[in-house]
Design a protein with these regions (language model features):
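Catalytic cores of the polymerase beta-like nucleotidyltransferase superfamily
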Residues: 1-182
Length: 182
């Protein structure tokens, strides 16, 4: 896990984004998914230029307000701070509905339920300290192995969602050394 911390800490843009998100003081907020995954994949492929962000996934957890409009308001606040970043904000207290799960207990639980393991990662700055959450194999992540999380594996009844996502994303074109595991 130290290697992941070191990658994030050494990237001033990533730290800046994490600090901007922290400044909003959203409950249980993190930056997740491709923001971190792509940095790791770029590094293991030896890329010196960063893959541009499709979006920066900001997540938070507020079970008392499931109205999607609040997410748009937070996106606007982030754009007001820095409009050059493609912000995407989602309340994880309502995202369980997307894949017919029980309501998540917090943001980390939601991240653990992401489709594939390398995407099920999040980071934040909290009280000036970097925190990273990743519940899957760090060795697999650092070796470019893409596999479904337990919630989308062959026995889950949702494996087709994983396969559809892998086919749609076409990650092997950007990162040809990835290994896809079932």
């Amino acid at each position: 896990m130290k290697a992941i911390y070191d990658l994030i800490k050494s990237d001033a843009d990533m730290i800046y984004i994490l600090e901007v998100v922290e400044s909003l003081n959203l409950n249980d907020s993190w930056v997740s998914a491709g923001f971190i995954r792509n940095k790791i994949w770029d590094t293991i492929h030896g890329y010196t230029a960063k893959t541009p962000y499709n979006d920066v996934d900001v997540i938070f957890y507020n079970a008392d307000c499931l109205d999607e409009s609040i997410e748009k308001r937070y996106e606007q606040q982030l754009r007001d701070i820095d409009s050059s970043i493609p912000w995407s904000v989602k309340n994880q207290a309502r995202m369980h509905l997307k894949n017919d799960f029980s309501q998540y207990i917090d943001s980390k639980d939601a991240v653990d339920h992401y489709t594939e393991a390398p995407t099920a990662i999040c980071a934040r700055i909290k009280n000036g300290e970097l925190e990273v959450h990743y519940n899957y194999s760090v060795q697999d992540l650092l070796n470019g192995i893409v596999s479904p999380t337990q919630y989308f594996n062959l026995d889950s009844g949702r494996y087709d969602v994983y396969l559809d996502r892998i086919n749609r994303k076409q990650w092997h074109k950007q990162w040809p050394n990835l290994k896809f595991d079932n």
